[in-house]
């Protein structure tokens, strides 16, 4: 935790370590958003309509043609960055479990109300997740028209395809030039190596792998209105947009890849708090009114801290003593296991309570 510009608390458990480069999963979406904000500032002439720029065109996404649904013509960059494109991505079922996956559903949100959407399963999950990384995102099914509902999915990867075409380089290289080098990050990368092969492109929907202190540096950059030392690395106008509700998403408290607490749905946290969760319980939080940045590490499975996923060298000896730990089951006095997102919000409330007690 960083408070008033100082590292005031740091504690690691199990495989977590200061030098670890875990797959932070959807925390990576925050960085995709930041990169898009920088892109729009540096290439303003390419985005005369700003976030309202329609991007399913030959200029930005020629790979998307022919469009799988004519409604895609109306998708704006702001829709991609708030998960309101209307695209429903395929579910990648494990071999032999396709029937189970098909029977499940995803939960969309329309003006605060849940909408259950039946899963659809990719017929070739290995190909879609690896070789056709871009195409499988671009050719999802439309469950509603752009802007008409929120659904957590692969929209930010599509935004990263737009970025790749506009700036002429991969998302990881762009982040390295615009943030990592100026801020002095240590070893970092993306979890691009999968069981089915290596991804051809930086995954815009997640997978960034930073040291814990560099994750905090990024949060501190946001808390300091996009400034690092004497440089404005992130456009202030974009930072102001991502930290409050977005007109592109009237359905849920999710702005430009950040959960925002303006509505007070995290009751124990200030309403100016904004943050992002990652699978398994990762969380990176900014609370401007308390001048506080928090990073919560976690683990989804054995692959989370596996250096084979990132290709980065292991520079420490992992502590495996907690590998078999499991939470206490539910009873009258114990809540039992909770989901990653619930845990992320609860952790925010507990840290805030400790800071203001």
Language model: regions and residue ranges:
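Non-transmembrane alpha-helical segments in soluble domains
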Residues: 37-40, 56, 78-82, 118, ...
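Short, charged, amphipathic alpha-helices and their helix-cap/turn boundaries
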Residues: 6-11, 56, 93-145, 169-189
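Active-site Gly/Thr loop motif
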Residues: 185-188, 192-193, 241-295
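Active-site rim elements
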Residues: 67-68, 145-149, 202-207, 271-280, ...
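Active-site-proximal alpha-helical segments within enzyme catalytic domains
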Residues: 155-162, 206-228, 282-299
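Structured C-terminal helix/loop/strand segments within mature extracytoplasmic catalytic/sensor domains
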Residues: 276-357
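A short, well-structured edge-of-sheet supersecondary motif
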Residues: 1-16, 284-285, 291-295
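Active-site helix/loop module of the DD-peptidase/beta-lactamase fold
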Residues: 23, 27, 41-88, 92, ...
């Amino acid at each position: 935790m960083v408070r008033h510009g100082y590292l005031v608390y740091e504690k690691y458990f199990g495989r977590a370590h200061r030098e670890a480069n875990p797959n932070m999963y959807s925390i990576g979406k925050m960085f995709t958003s930041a990169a898009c904000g920088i892109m729009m500032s540096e290439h303003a002439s390419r985005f005369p309509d700003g976030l309202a720029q329609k991007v399913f065109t030959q200029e930005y996404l020629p790979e998307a043609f022919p469009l799988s649904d004519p409604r895609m013509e109306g998708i704006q960059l702001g829709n991609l960055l708030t998960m309101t494109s209307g695209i429903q991505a395929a579910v990648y079922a494990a071999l032999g479990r396709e029937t189970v996956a098909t029977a499940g559903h995803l939960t969309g949100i329309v003006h605060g109300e849940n909408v259950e959407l039946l899963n659809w399963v990719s017929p070739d999950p290995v190909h879609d997740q690896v070789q056709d990384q871009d195409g499988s995102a671009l050719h999802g099914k439309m469950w509603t028209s752009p802007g008409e509902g929120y659904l957590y999915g692969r929209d930010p990867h599509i935004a990263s395809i737009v970025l790749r075409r506009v700036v002429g380089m991969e998302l990881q290289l762009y982040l390295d030039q615009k943030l990592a080098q100026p801020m002095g990050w240590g070893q970092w990368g993306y979890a691009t190596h999968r069981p089915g092969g290596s991804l051809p492109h930086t995954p815009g929907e997640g997978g960034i792998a930073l040291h814990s202190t560099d994750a905090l540096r990024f949060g501190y950059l946001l808390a300091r209105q996009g400034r690092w030392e004497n440089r404005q690395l992130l456009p202030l106008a974009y930072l102001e947009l991502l930290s409050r509700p977005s007109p592109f998403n009237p359905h849920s408290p999710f702005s430009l890849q950040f959960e925002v607490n303006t509505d007070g749905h995290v009751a124990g946290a200030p309403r100016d708090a904004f943050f992002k969760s990652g699978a398994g319980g990762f969380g990176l939080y900014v609370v401007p009114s308390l001048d506080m940045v928090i990073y919560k590490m976690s683990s989804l499975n054995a692959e989370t801290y596996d250096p084979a996923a990132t290709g980065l060298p292991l520079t420490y000896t992992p502590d495996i003593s907690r590998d078999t730990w499991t939470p206490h089951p539910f009873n009258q006095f114990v809540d039992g296991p909770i989901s990653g997102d619930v845990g992320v919000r609860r952790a925010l409330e507990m840290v805030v309570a400790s800071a203001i007690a």
